[in-house]
Amino acid sequence: MMKKSAFLAVIILMFCNACSIKGSFQGLYSYYYKTKSQDPLLLIVPDTSTSLCEINKPDTPRIIVINGSILKECIKTNNKAVVYLWAPKCKGKFCYSLNLLQQECDTRGVALYIVAEYYDTQLMQINYKINKPISGIDVEYYNSNRTSKYLSRFIYDLTLRKDMSGRLIYFEDGVFKKSFESIEEI
């Protein structure tokens, strides 16, 4: 019995030693600090005297670091607006090309605000054909580096709702109306 237990322990140790996790934990953590160190000029934290609405999309990609309350104030300046919670590495059915999403919103007369769920230096350095700069959630403001924690706080600040289904959040005259998955619902 003792030999069998020792043999089993050796097999388990060998199996665990041979296993490794490939890839990153993007989506679980923000990667804000990694992005900040890789490309310090990519992230812009606006001073409190500058309104998010006044920041134009620069010629080179820049990510505006914001919280939900700041974005909510800017959304109030539009008749219709959609916030897209962008997961840069998302490959699912309801993950959209930023360029396509901008075209759809332009066709429907809806302002588009893109907010990255987490930071990805490589995909954030692309110069997308969008009207407004991409925003990133301020993890220091929300005092968390875990995506689920700061994202739920951001959404609450934006909509005053605790739970949300869908990556697209729709507003009329600054008031939250609904959230949805499909761009056809815009």
Kindly label every feature range from the protein language model.
Residues 1-5:
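Positively charged n-region of N-terminal signal peptides that target proteins for export
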Residues 15-18:
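C-terminal motif of bacterial Sec signal peptides marking the signal peptidase cleavage site
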Residues 127-165:
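Short, internal strand/loop/helix patches
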Residues 182-186:
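A short acidic/small-residue loop/turn micro-motif
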Residues 23-74:
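N-terminal "domain-start" segment that seeds a small globular fold
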Residues 164-179:
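A short, hydrophobic beta-strand/beta-hairpin element that forms part of a small beta-sheet core
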Residues 72-100:
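Short active-site neighborhood of thiol/selenol oxidoreductases, capturing the structured segment around
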Residues 83, 94-133:
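Structural microenvironment flanking redox-active thiols in thiol-disulfide oxidoreductases
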